[in-house]
Amino acid sequence: MSNIVIVGSGPAGVSAALYAVRAGVQTTVLTKGSGALERAEKIENYYGFAQPVSGPELERRSIENARRLGVQFVQTEAVGLTWTDRLTVETLAGAYPADA
């Protein structure tokens, strides 16, 4: 099975993770937290939400849904990328090899 490593757990990162895991790809999201979404008081007109939702609540629900489908989240900071025979995301917690 191929695997993908996504850097960042904002809406784009979690959306990418959802599509990847639904396609049968082992998916890991690297997150350091403290993104703009965590500081947003109110998000309006977001797809799937009839009423405004706080940034932290939207983030919590999105990550919960992704975890339910099998996405792995790792709390760390990406600090570099290397490419030899395979892509590797270097983080403060170690290296994460990936196919994409």
Positions of the model-derived regions?
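Mid-chain, well-packed structural core segment of small domains
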Residues: 70, 78-79, 98
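Core beta-strand elements of the Rossmann-like FAD/NAD(P) dinucleotide-binding domain
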Residues: 2, 91-100
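Short active-site-adjacent helix-start/loop capping segments
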Residues: 37-38, 81-83, 97
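A generic structural signal for short beta-strands and their flanking turns/coil linkers
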Residues: 42, 69, 85-87, 94
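Short glycine-rich, polar/acidic loop-and-turn segments at beta strand-coil junctions
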Residues: 62, 77-79, 93
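A conserved short coil-to-beta-strand element within the FAD-binding core of flavoproteins
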Residues: 74-87
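Beta1-alpha1 glycine-rich phosphate/pyrophosphate-binding loop at the start
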Residues: 2-69
